[in-house]
Swiss-Prot record:
Belongs to the gamma-glutamyl phosphate reductase family. Pathway: Amino-acid biosynthesis; L-proline biosynthesis; L-glutamate 5-semialdehyde from L-glutamate: step 2/2. InterPro entries: Ald_DH/histidinol_DH, Ald_DH_C, Ald_DH_N, Aldehyde_DH_dom, G-glutamylP_reductase_CS, Glu-5-SA_DH, GPR_dom. PROSITE patterns: PROA. It is an enzyme of class 1 (oxidoreductase). The gene is proA. HAMAP family: ProA. GO terms for biological process: L-proline biosynthetic process. GO terms for molecular function: glutamate-5-semialdehyde dehydrogenase activity; NADP binding. Keywords: Amino-acid biosynthesis, Cytoplasm, NADP, Oxidoreductase, Proline biosynthesis. Its EC number is 1.2.1.41. It is found in: Cytoplasm. NCBIfam families: PRK00197.1, proA. This is Gamma-glutamyl phosphate reductase. It comes from Proteus mirabilis (strain HI4320).
Amino acid sequence: MLEQMGKAAREASWHLAQLSTEQKNQALLVIADLLEQQEAIILAANEKDMVAARESNINAAMLDRLLLTSERLKAIADDVRQVCHLEDPVGQVIDGRLLDSGLRLERRRVPLGVVGVIYEARPNVTIDVASLCLKTGNAAILRGGKETHHTNQAVVAVIQQALETCAIPAAAIQAIDKPDRELVAKMLKMDEYIDMLIPRGGAGLHKLCREQSTIPVITGGIGVCHTFVDESADLDQALNVIINAKVQRPSACNSLETLLVHEAIAESFLPQLSDAMAAQKVTLHASQRAITALKKGRATVVDVTEADYCDEWLSLDLNVEVVNDLTAAIAHIRQYGTAHSDAILTQSISHADRFVRQVDSAAVYVNASTRFTDGGQFGLGAEVAVSTQKLHARGPMGLDALTTYKWIGYGDNTLRR
């Protein structure tokens, strides 16, 4: 089955690569319209997944990711329409030069070919990936989690109907709809057909893909994000930034997980932090250096563990540690961070510059929330993932990250001498 899907995807990718921007945009508009027109079918399928998820005692954060509503589906359809307004990178000339030989050389963006995506209980990913791959002329093979089985079937059926309406092969967007985990292991070996693999899920999924895939893998999305409050920070403003980074959307990979506080301000700042977090119903996981001052406020405070520093909370929980200075803060981030998004709150230009130079993360912020690490916020449009590695793509992956390039030489019967 998988080999047939791979062959069909490869064939479809050649067709997609020839489409004009107008043809691709038309297909996207049809997808968006059909998502709304077939709302009842999609939501009924999603309800089947929700019932099964509740019976399996899936946690609240996962249930929220899995849930589709009329409003959410409308927003997803609107997001697909927004992709139409994004600049098509395919065919763009990155650079070029005229060689001494007379050969005119260009480096031009082209589609990757076939993109594989493995993800968990996120039905929106099915549509996000499909729309971005279509815009960039790539075919896609999707493997969603068993939790989204019925929803993905319904959504992919809509997408394929739209593609066929626009005379595009339905195999351009395919989904593995069997929950058999052995199929994941086989998919990881399909380097003959899949050009790039993107896992969207927890650390275990990323580890599996890194260790077993023969396909180039883009890893990321694991966000143990830090903010360091320096001794010179504006503490009132710092509280606002911390609340935004932690509370706005705790389940996001760019939400704040560990707060580091300079020891010079800890006694005065931590009680204020505790009161602010209590108002937001955030539980604080405190080190021995932080716990006494935090308990002077109203928040629920518990002891932090070593494991807490290593994992994403993705909930209204926050680690708090007091550090000696900037050097210690950077050392902590190097030890426990995931190279996703880290921030410093400071009024010291030299400290800000040093933090930016020495913290090796995909996104580093000065006096700003880590929540900005997002394709839409960066002005890239939609994103297919957030990469925390350094090769091919780093940070939010917009349309450009779903392309590669080829060299094109124009001559006049030009010979190499």
